[in-house]
């Protein structure tokens, strides 16, 4: 079900602490995937959020609906931040094939520094553990799968 793209839709990807939340600050609408997952599983615990691989269909449907609602509200630039699975990207591209894909590249050392500096309450484990969770490794598959469609930004 392809949607007419009157508005700019950008999907922003990157590993943990790559700056997804602060990139495209000027967007008219930012849709944060972890907020959607929190709503689905009723938790903000990092372990629970990272154990969401089985929710890809539900997350994809919710994202498509949220993009549609934002576009109907005349939001010119809609940013989706933090998709972690290829199957979700595929679903969005089926509906919005002209969406721009942006990968934020940041060296591991810088991501670790950011992780340790932010002292977020949800960060209950070491950077090394968080960075090697199944959901983070799935994120790397996005890079591998969509390499030719990605705009790669050095975000450091």
How should these model regions be labeled?
Residues 15:
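P-loop (Walker A) phosphate-binding loop of NTP-binding proteins
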Residues 81-83, 94-118:
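Conserved phosphate-donor/acceptor-positioning beta-strand/loop module used by diverse small-molecule
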Residues 116-156:
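Small-molecule kinase domains that catalyze NTP-dependent phosphoryl transfer to phosphate-bearing small molecules
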Residues 18:
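ATP-binding Walker
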């Amino acid at each position: 079900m392809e949607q007419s793209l009157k508005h700019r839709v950008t999907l922003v990807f990157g590993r943990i602490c790559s700056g997804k939340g602060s990139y495209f600050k000027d967007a008219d609408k930012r849709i944060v995937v972890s907020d959607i997952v929190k709503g689905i599983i009723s938790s903000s615990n990092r372990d629970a959020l990272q154990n969401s691989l089985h929710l890809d269909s539900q997350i994809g449907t919710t994202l498509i609906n949220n993009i549609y609602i934002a576009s109907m509200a005349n939001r010119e630039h809609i940013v989706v931040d933090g998709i972690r699975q290829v199957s979700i990207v595929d679903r969005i591209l089926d509906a919005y094939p002209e969406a721009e894909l942006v990968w934020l590249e940041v060296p591991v050392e810088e991501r670790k520094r950011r992780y340790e500096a932010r002292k977020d309450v949800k960060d209950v484990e070491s950077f090394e553990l968080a960075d090697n969770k199944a959901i983070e490794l799935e994120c790397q598959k996005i890079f591998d799968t969509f390499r030719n469609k990605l705009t790669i930004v050095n975000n450091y």
